[in-house]
Amino acid sequence: MGNCKDKDHLPAFTQIDTGPDSPTWLKQAVFYQIYPQSFYDTNGDGIGDILGIIHKLDYLQWLGINAIWINPCFVSPFQDGGYDVMDYYRIAPRYGTNRDLYQLCREAHRRQIKVCLDLVAGHTAIDHPWFKASCQPRRNKYSDRYIWTSSAISEADVPLSFIRGYSERDISYVANCFYFQPALNYGFAKPAACQSWQQPIDAPGPLETRKELMKIMDFWLSHGVDGFRVDMAFSLVKLDPGHKETIKLWQDIVQRIHVLYPKVVLISEWGNPEESIAAGFDIDFMLHFGLEGYTDLMLSEKSFFRRHSDGNIGNFVKLYLEQAAKVQSKGLISVPSANHDVKRPCADGRTVKDLKVIFTFLLTWPGVPFIYYGDEIGMRYIPGLASKEGGYGRTGSRTPMQWDDGPNAGFSMAGKDQLYLPLDPRQNRPTTKKQASDPRSLLNHVRALIALRKRSPALQAVGTLIPLQGENNDRHFAYLRQSGSERFLIVLNPSAQSSQVRITGIKIYNLAPQICHGTQACVEGDNIQIHLDGASYGIFKL
């Protein structure tokens, strides 16, 4: 089956550590992503709110969570679920008030839980007062806050999305995603001489935009927020090959913010850790876009964590190790369970057994784990839902949290037809209440994994990772985690077939099972022989 010393294409990295400016608590961090409109409703309007998050902080503390990321909660027309902001300085009334958010920070901190907000840095809503002012033909303070071409009927030969004929201003604006998300102007990396509308990054307009972004960050940090997940962080400077100027822009922002808030946590939606960590972010995600590899885990037809598949994990491991070697002590990488843009793990026929294997991997892998709300109980991706607030095919991953077997699964006291989205219609849908009392549940499995991770430095964000098995077409995966003298062997078999694993080439002083299912292991001299049933996992302390 191979020796760990022969894995030339799966090289070990000896140590990953957070940089000197990164908060040390990130080494033990387990994040929980909250889609606020679907989490918990306290006022009976069918939409989750900030007070609902406060109400459930004790649950998150019980689970072992020590940081939360809240999707956009600012004033918005909600054409894209809040990723179209109208006012960066005010909480959307449907979620509550600014005072509610300040209270959330205080209550979370009392439970040793950090709070990170979602910062949409690259664009605003089309209804934002800045954009309305920018649309005016007469020049004003906001004329250059967005990117406008020189003529509404010109065909600019550049790879950007132009929206024409929207306003009386005789020019087109650039949109980032949907037409109603006009791109903020941070300048162009190399403005074309023949395109006078392409402003350099140090022009007055782009500099004012940058200053406003820092002002927004300062406002929320001064009220107790611990950091931000930055939406599309790579997209700010336009026509920027390799994102070189965007990296410089973020380096400038991070340096200035750190003067006032040295412990701020910055998480990027970038998908290329080598670039984002260089830009000054503490964490970057392995994503469904960006560098290839993440989809090999759960999302593709031949993903590794699919029971009836011939997928292997080698491509993901190779990519992860390459990126980890490049960022080294400067930052961390996250492999999320899912997010609001992709299918949940509980999709495509996966069962609780399958999900337990997935979480065993996610919570023993280096970097910072992010759990999408409801994944810890195996909430299902609901196919075929009508699009809500620009969700389209993503809508099925945004349904209300399932707390108990009461009305609306304990999410809201509103009428069924008033709920933000329909609930999972299954009679046996999972709930936190049922699973909390079942020691064999997915929820208690996740809780036990988090507890083991927290008390075991070798299983946390930094330290040694040595892949032992999983190359070629293996349907199992084995790896070693180590910190100082503490060592753990993790073995996974997500397939339907049983498997035999033989580990050689490592010193064995002990073989103590920690969290295991369907595994039988024995020591034979300097070797470990492990039998893995289908859909099984094992964590052994060596």
Description of each model-found segment:
Residues 2-211, 222, 233-280, 401:
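Acidic/aromatic-lined carbohydrate-recognition and catalytic surfaces
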Residues 13, 26, 258-260, 280, ...:
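Loop/helix patches that line or flank the sugar-binding groove of alpha-linked glycan CAZymes
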Residues 66-67, 112-114, 217, 226-229, ...:
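Beta-sheet entry/capping signal
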Residues 125-135, 270-301, 380-392:
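Substrate-binding cleft/loops of secretory-pathway carbohydrate-active enzymes
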Residues 216-239, 335-339:
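Active-site groove signature of glycoside hydrolases
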Residues 315, 320-340:
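Aromatic-lined glycan-binding groove of carbohydrate-active enzymes
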Residues 498-518:
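Beta-strand-rich binding/interaction modules
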Residues 524-542:
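C-terminal beta-strand-rich structural cap/linker in extracellular carbohydrate-active enzymes
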